[in-house]
């Protein structure tokens, strides 16, 4: 109880004390208040009044810490007392709180509130409460430098900037936006910036920046540096053309800015140049303008701005003036030294430089390259190795550049003069100690006198030396710099010459090494050099090195052993720059340092990780078994980073894998495995190789070699050996067969020839054959095919084209045949083949023979192909009847009347053509020309019948003596004499394939003319027979009188030969000529009374010529005429069968006396005046046999042309016309004279021969080329009126008249026969 009372008393006492304190406003804990500047804040202070009773009066005081008097006092209702700093902003809030408006940073601090009760006593120390006011404010400058501040160049300046704020701001300095930090140039501390050593680069704007979390404050100050101007925009190099304006700019800055600009050209004021001051202007901004620039204005221009402070700066630029090339100061005389090289120089001035310089000498262009020893240099000068007098002259040059030229130079005369020469030469070397005197002599002479100068090669010497007037070089005191090479130069207007000497100064320190080279690696450097002159003493070297970024005091010295001139420096840092230099020293001192070489050591190679290479194995390996081996195929890897280089194929038979091929191309996808063992199980796998990386193996493919057969051996060409063997065997078999066939053919041919040699030569025969005009063999050449066709015929060739079977004569008919016909029939049993045309030969005619009986008549026997038939009479020829082959001639018209007509001949008559030979050349005309007396005859005016031999119809209108379209040979007759139409035998190409021309066709019946096949197909002979002569009316000598015939009034065509030269007689014949038989007696001519008229025979002579349709006829040679063969001998009165198949009467003539005194009767006579000296060939044995008088068969030569038309059959429309041939000229004839014309015994007749003058082949050779050959021609006329009769009696031939000669060529039977060597004939006169 007592405790409870004590506690209650204590609590009452406590409560009473607390109430007393509250009532007095006492607070012990301070209060913190924060506000932002510019805002209002309340500082609280509470007053507690008693619960009961009236509140006592009190006074409120607010104190700020640091202010001795209250800033705010309030009592009762009286107005408050406010400190002036708070006036308008402080007021009482509530009972005792203080309200501050628009607080400032200065308002921040501690505030104390006191409440004084007027009715109580209390301790003032304990009375009151505290409040701390915090004001947050952005920075504000309390101190800043001026906006512009000046400083002298070279001095220092400090700029201070102070800022206040809550929290306290941080102050920094910036220049042109760049933060400045403390360095050697700038010092920054507590908002102050100090700039030392002010320069022009320090000028500009400086910024003070104060910042805190409440914001920032910035202040800028411009620093102006007082000093000389600074060039902001210097001038630049420009290029202008001549006569243009140039503009050079220059802009400078300075403080103070009273700038003036001055321009200089080549360090001289532009206004001081006389030629330039009138054309320049300087603008206020410093720009220089040059008007109408000239080439002389080019150069360096300098801009100098100034403001009277310090040293003015300068900036330079170059002006380039472009202009065409020109020549300046061309000397009037050019001196060129004699004996040494010299120069002809052209002083060219051009911008851009000249590209071409052309020279003129004496007004003509000079081609420098054509002068030996002259060279045109790049600058346009001419270098002459050794000038001669040829170089003398006046020279001008014309330079060109891209802008052209200003013209040529002034003329300069070249003068040759002797060059200067040295009279005293310096020595090769001079050695002298340093500090001593030295004199080096040198003297020269020349015209003009040369000037001598001395120069040091390389670095010039700065020692005391001079050149004496005599030319010598004098050193008063030698120094180290005088060491080296010196040259003495003698110069005049001609040229300059030099002489060299070497000066060695001993007793000095070494010279600096040269050519320092450094080769580095990552940690080493190899330093090498070339030693300089040692000064006369032994020298050593040391290498100095340092890092490039170190200072000049960081050089390290490395000694070099005695001898070598290199040093390997190691322990270097990779990828670091080092500097090296070499120093030499001897007993007298050290040399200068060599040049400093800076190098960088190599860096360590950067180790880069190897790229991930993805190598996958090949896919889908398969094995296909074949008979030759195993075909392995696969697919390339699915993913691979690099191209596949190759594949590796492996195989195994057991457990071990072996390599089959390791070079399979990467582009292949298959492999063929061969040469495998039989009955073995193989397993294969493939691997891919890419850049030395091998993939994993592919899948395994297994195959058995049970059915695999080894591949056959192949050759290098890929053929199997059995195939190759078969090919070789086939080739060998064919070769053997060809060889055997060739040998067999040769053997058979040889046997055939032997049989032919053993047989008696049968008489020639004529076969009818029709050849196509379009045959390719008609071009004048004998092809090998035609010759082969004409060889000895076979049975098949004989029967071809002859459908009728052979007919045997009845016994009665055989008994009626005479002995001669039986013999002829036996001989004619020999078979002949006929050459067929390639295109149109349809059938061959039977072989028929014509012969002459003992009575001199021509008889015809049957051939084996068809029986003999009775001949029919021919209109106009009562002595001839038509037989199987040719008309048979009799002495009366009643003999041998045989009404039978051969069927084969009748069938072939319309098909016969006059052109059958494959050659187009001509043979001589026939040997005899029947000519009727030109009396007043009455005959038919035209031909009305059809030509059976040619298949052409004669037009009904008469065409007397018209020229054919193939024969244009005009006759030449005497004045007043009308030439009769010609009567020539048509030409034949080859007797092997020719068709006989037909005589005039009459109503009594036609007849055909067979061809003459050469026996056994052999070639025609080129030999000729002797010529025969028949005297004519006014052209024969007296012994050759014209006989009169009693049958002059008959009506028949007149036949004659012209007296002109035939175009076949050109080349001289070298063939043997058979002799004429003299033993045959002439027979009297039996002429019926009704014969139409007299016939005169002439022997015309033709000359070689081409086919009339092929071109102009060449002129005949003046000499060397052919001798022509004679016809077989016939008795007088008989009708001789000519080549045209008609009867010619043999006329009797008186026998003239033989030359040489040989008289007596003679059967034939020749005019000896027709001969020229010509060798007489000896006849071959075969020809002699043919000329025997016992043989009486005559084979007539066929013709290609019809005797009626004188033109070949062709596709031309209309009938061919008659043509008159030119009269042949006289040639060589047979020497013997005969009183009558005879016919030679039968011989192989051929008119084909080589006609070229150079032909010297054997008689058996036939012409296969297009050379002309002799062909006889025949001309007919159908009107026998209008021929004037020449006066009777002999008359000497007129000058220019020619005698007609015919010739026939015998043909050897075999190819192997050669004619005997010719014998020279007797020379006969040709005049008369």
From Swiss-Prot:
One of its GO terms (cellular component) is postsynaptic specialization of symmetric synapse. The modification Phosphoserine is found at residues 775, 783, 794, 1207, 1215. Residues 512-604, 614-708 form the Fibronectin type-III domain. It holds the Pfam family fn3. Glycans are attached at residues 241, 258, 624. It comes from the Eukaryota. The modification Omega-N-methylarginine is found at residue 1136. Residues 1284-1295, 1318-1328 have a biased composition (Pro residues). Transmembrane protein which is abundantly expressed in interneurons, where it may regulate inhibitory synapse development. May mediate homophilic cell adhesion. Belongs to the immunoglobulin superfamily. Turtle family. This is Protein turtle homolog B. The gene is Igsf9b.
């Amino acid at each position: 109880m007592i405790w409870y009372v004590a506690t209650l008393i204590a609590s009452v006492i406590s409560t009473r004390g607390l109430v007393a304190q509250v009532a007095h406003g006492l607070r012990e804990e301070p209060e913190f208040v924060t506000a932002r500047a510019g805002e209002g804040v309340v500082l609280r202070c509470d007053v507690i009044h008693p619960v009961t009773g009236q509140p006592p009066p009190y006074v409120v005081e607010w104190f700020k810490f640091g202010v001795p008097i209250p800033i705010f006092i309030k009592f009762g209702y009286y107005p408050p007392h406010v400190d002036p700093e708070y006036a308008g902003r402080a007021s009482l809030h509530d009972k005792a709180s203080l309200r501050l408006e628009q607080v400032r940073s200065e308002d921040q601090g501690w505030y104390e509130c006191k409440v004084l009760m007027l009715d109580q006593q209390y301790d003032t120390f304990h009375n009151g409460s505290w409040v701390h006011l915090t004001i947050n404010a952005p920075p504000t400058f309390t101190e800043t430098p001026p906006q512009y501040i000046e400083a002298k160049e070279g001095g220092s300046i400090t700029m201070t900037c102070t800022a206040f704020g809550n929290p306290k701001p941080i102050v920094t300095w910036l220049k042109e936006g760049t933060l400045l930090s403390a360095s050697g140039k700038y010092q920054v501390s507590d908002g102050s910036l100090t700039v030392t050593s002010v320069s022009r680069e320090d000028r500009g704007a400086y910024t003070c920046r104060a910042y805190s979390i409440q914001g920032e404050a910035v202040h800028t100050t411009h620093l102006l540096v007082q000093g000389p101007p600074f060039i902001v925009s210097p001038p630049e190099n420009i290029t202008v053309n001549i006569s243009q304006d140039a503009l050079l700019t220059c802009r400078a800055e300075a403080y103070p800015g009273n700038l003036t600009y001055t321009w200089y050209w080549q360090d001289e004021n532009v206004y001081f140049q006389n030629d330039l001051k009138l054309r320049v202007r300087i603008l206020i901004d410093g720009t220089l303008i040059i008007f109408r620039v000239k080439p002389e204005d080019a150069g360096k221009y300098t801009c100098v701005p100034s403001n009277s402070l310090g040293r003015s700066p300068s900036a330079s630029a170059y002006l380039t003036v472009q202009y065409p090339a020109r020549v300046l100061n061309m000397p009037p005389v050019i001196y060129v030294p004699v004996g040494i090289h010299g120069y002809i120089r052209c002083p060219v001035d051009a911008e851009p430089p000249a590209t071409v310089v052309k020279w003129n000498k004496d007004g003509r262009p000079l081609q420098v390259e054509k002068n030996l020893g002259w060279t045109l240099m790049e600058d346009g000068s001419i270098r002459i190795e050794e000038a001669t007098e040829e170089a003398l002259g006046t020279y001008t040059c014309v330079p060109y550049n891209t802008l052209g030229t200003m013209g040529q130079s002034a003329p300069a005369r070249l003068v040759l003069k002797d060059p200067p020469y040295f009279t005293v030469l310096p020595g090769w070397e001079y050695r002298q100690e340093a500090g001593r005197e030295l004199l080096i002599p040198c003297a020269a002479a020349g015209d003009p006198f040369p000037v001598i100068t001395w120069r040091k090669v390389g670095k010039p010497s700065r020692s005391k030396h001079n050149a004496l007037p005599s030319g010598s070089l004098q050193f008063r005191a030698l120094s180290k710099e005088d060491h080296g090479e010196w040259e003495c130069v003698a110069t005049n207007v001609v040229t300059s010459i030099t002489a060299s000497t070497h000066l060695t100064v001993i007793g000095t320190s070494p010279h600096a090494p040269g050519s320092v080279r450094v080769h580095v690696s990552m940690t080493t450097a190899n330093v090498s050099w070339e030693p300089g002159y040692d000064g006369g003493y032994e020298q050593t070297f040391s290498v100095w090195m340092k890092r490039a970024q170190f200072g000049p005091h960081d050089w390290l010295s490395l000694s070099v052993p005695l001898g070598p001139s290199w040093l390997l420096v190691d322990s270097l840092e990779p990828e670091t720059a080092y500097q090296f230099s070499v120093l030499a020293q001897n007993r007298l001192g050290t040399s200068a340092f060599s040049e400093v070489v800076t190098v960088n050591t190599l860096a360590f190679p950067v180790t880069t990780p190897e790229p991930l290479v993805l190598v996958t194995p090949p896919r889908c390996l398969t094995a296909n078994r074949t008979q030759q081996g195993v075909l392995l195929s696969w697919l390339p890897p699915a993913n691979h980073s690099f191209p596949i280089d190759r594949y590796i194929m492996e195989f195994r038979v057991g457990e071990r894998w072996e390599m089959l091929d390791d070079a399979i191309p990467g582009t292949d996808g298959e492999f063929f495995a061969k040469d495998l063992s039989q009955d073995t199980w193989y397993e294969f796998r493939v691997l891919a190789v890419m850049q030395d990386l091998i993939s994993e193996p592919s899948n395994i493919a297994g195959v058995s070699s049970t059915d695999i057969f080894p591949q056959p051996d192949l050759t290098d060409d890929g053929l199997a050996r059995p195939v190759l063997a078969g090919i070789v065997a086939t080739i060998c078999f064919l070769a053997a067969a060809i060889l055997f066939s060739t040998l067999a053919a040769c053997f058979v041919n040889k046997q055939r020839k032997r049989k032919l040699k053993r047989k008696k030569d049968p008489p020639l025969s004529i076969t009818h054959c029709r050849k196509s005009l379009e045959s390719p063999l008609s071009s004048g050449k004998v092809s090998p095919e035609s010759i082969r066709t004409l060889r000895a015929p076979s049975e098949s060739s004989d029967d071809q084209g002859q459908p009728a079977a052979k007919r045997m004569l009845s016994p009665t008919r055989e008994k009626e045949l005479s002995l001669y016909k039986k013999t002829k029939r036996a001989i004619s049993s020999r078979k002949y083949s006929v050459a067929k045309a390639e295109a149109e030969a349809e059938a061959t005619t039977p072989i028929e023979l014509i012969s002459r009986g003992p009575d001199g008549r021509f008889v015809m026997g049957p051939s084996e192909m068809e029986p003999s038939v009775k001949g029919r009479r021919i209109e106009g020829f009562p002595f001839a009847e038509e037989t199987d082959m040719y008309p048979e001639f009799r002495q009366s018209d009643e003999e041998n009347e045989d009404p039978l007509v051969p069927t084969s001949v009748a069938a072939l008559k319309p098909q016969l053509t006059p052109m059958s030979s494959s050659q187009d050349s001509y043979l001589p005309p026939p040997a005899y020309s029947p000519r009727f007396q030109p009396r007043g005859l009455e005959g038919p005016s035209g031909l009305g019948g059809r030509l059976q031999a040619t298949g052409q119809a004669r037009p009904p209108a008469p065409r007397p003596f018209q020229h054919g379209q193939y024969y244009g040979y005009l006759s030449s007759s005497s004045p007043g004499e009308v030439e009769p139409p010609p009567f020539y035998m048509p030409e034949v190409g080859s007797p092997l394939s020719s068709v006989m021309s037909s005589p005039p066709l009459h109503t009594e019946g036609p007849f055909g003319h067979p061809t003459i096949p050469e026996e056994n197909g052999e070639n025609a002979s080129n030999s000729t027979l002797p010529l025969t002569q028949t005297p004519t009316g006014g052209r024969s000598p007296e012994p050759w009188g014209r006989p009169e015939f009693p049958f002059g009034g008959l009506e028949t065509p007149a036949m004659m030969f012209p007296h002109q030269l035939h175009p076949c007689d050109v080349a001289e014949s070298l063939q043997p000529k058979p002799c004429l038989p003299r033993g045959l007696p002439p027979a009297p001519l039996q002429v019926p009374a009704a014969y139409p008229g007299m016939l005169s025979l002439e022997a015309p002579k033709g000359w070689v010529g081409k086919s009339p349709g092929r071109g102009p006829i060449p002129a005949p040679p003046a000499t060397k005429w052919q001798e022509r063969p004679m016809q077989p001998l016939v008795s007088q009165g008989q009708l001789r069968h000519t080549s045209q198949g008609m009867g010619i009467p043999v006329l009797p003539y008186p026998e003239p006396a033989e030359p040489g005194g040989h008289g007596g009767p003679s059967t034939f006579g020749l005019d000896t005046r027709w001969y020229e000296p010509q060798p007489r060939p000896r006849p071959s044995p075969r020809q002699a046999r043919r000329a025997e008088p016992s043989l009486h068969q005559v084979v007539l030569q066929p013709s290609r042309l019809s005797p009626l038309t004188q033109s070949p059959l062709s596709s031309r429309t209309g009938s061919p016309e008659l043509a008159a041939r030119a009269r042949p000229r006289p040639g060589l004839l047979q020497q013997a004279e005969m009183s009558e014309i005879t016919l030679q015994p039968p011989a192989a007749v051929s008119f084909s021969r080589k006609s070229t003058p150079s032909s010297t082949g054997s008689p058996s050779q036939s012409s296969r080329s297009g050379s002309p050959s002799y062909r006889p021609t025949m001309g007919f006329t159908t009107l026998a009126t209008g021929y004037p009769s020449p006066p009777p009696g002999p008359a000497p031939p007129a000058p220019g008249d020619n005698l007609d000669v015919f010739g026939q060529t015998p043909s050897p039977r075999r190819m192997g026969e050669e004619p005997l060597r010719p014998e020279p004939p007797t020379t006969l006169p040709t005049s008369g």
